[in-house]
Regions:
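Residue-level signal for short, function-critical loop segments
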Residues: 7, 86
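Extracytoplasmic/lumenal domain signature
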Residues: 1, 10-11, 16-62, 74-80, ...
């Protein structure tokens, strides 16, 4: 079994006394016969102290990169495709707001396709905090489809309101992108996406 991890810790940043943030997104492989951990893949480095807030509270980063949805299994390639969310605190990292391919046997990250760089967002951002990103997580899983021409691709929808077509056979290379809605912290594509042949085949 493959278990993703996400967190609402970014909402705690609104408390001036809260030491924010130390959550790290991950995927864990468990042995279904006894529940033992086979491997665990962290998606962001260990947070470290980066400064002190105006309230005198320690600040930590990097953090975040939660996985809000189930991984997509590609048994033929032996890969898991994982859709990630934003960073909660600086510094921003290259695995946030991204589609990642992990080796199913080891958890090793095989490739990363980040679609929104520098997206750092927490609960202080709506109050005008500096250096805030757009909160454009991938909250829905990527869909592995076969296009009309027989080509396999990954289709992933983001809170930005953009759908992306990626090539799983070529390191997640971006094939196309299409805006289908208005993005935002509660907009775009969040908790699911239908499989549509017109989108998968043409990106339009």
């Amino acid at each position: 079994a493959f278990v993703p991890a996400a967190s609402w810790e970014e909402t705690r940043a609104v408390d001036p006394a809260y030491v924010c943030c130390t959550f790290r997104g991950s995927v864990t492989a468990l042995n279904v016969s006894d529940g033992s951990v086979v491997w665990k893949s962290w998606l962001v480095d260990e947070p470290r102290k980066t400064g002190v807030s105006a309230a005198g509270t320690d600040l930590y980063g990097p953090s975040g990169v939660g996985v809000w949805s189930a991984p997509t299994v590609d048994a033929r390639r032996g890969l898991l495709y994982v859709a990630t969310g934003d960073n909660y605190t600086h510094p921003a990292t290259d695995k946030s707001d991204a589609i990642l391919a992990l080796d199913m046997k080891s958890g090793r990250i095989v490739w990363t396709q980040q679609t929104t760089a520098g997206d750092v967002f927490n609960a202080t951002c709506p109050r005008g905090a500096p250096n805030c990103g757009p909160d454009h997580d991938f909250a829905a899983p990527a869909i592995l489809v076969r296009a009309a021409n027989g080509r396999e691709m990954l289709v992933a929808g983001q809170k930005s309101g953009v759908v992306f077509g990626l090539d799983p056979a070529d390191g997640g290379r971006l094939l196309w992108q299409t805006r289908v809605g208005q993005g935002g912290t509660a907009g775009g594509i969040q908790w699911g996406m239908a499989r549509m042949s017109i989108v998968a085949s043409t990106g339009s």
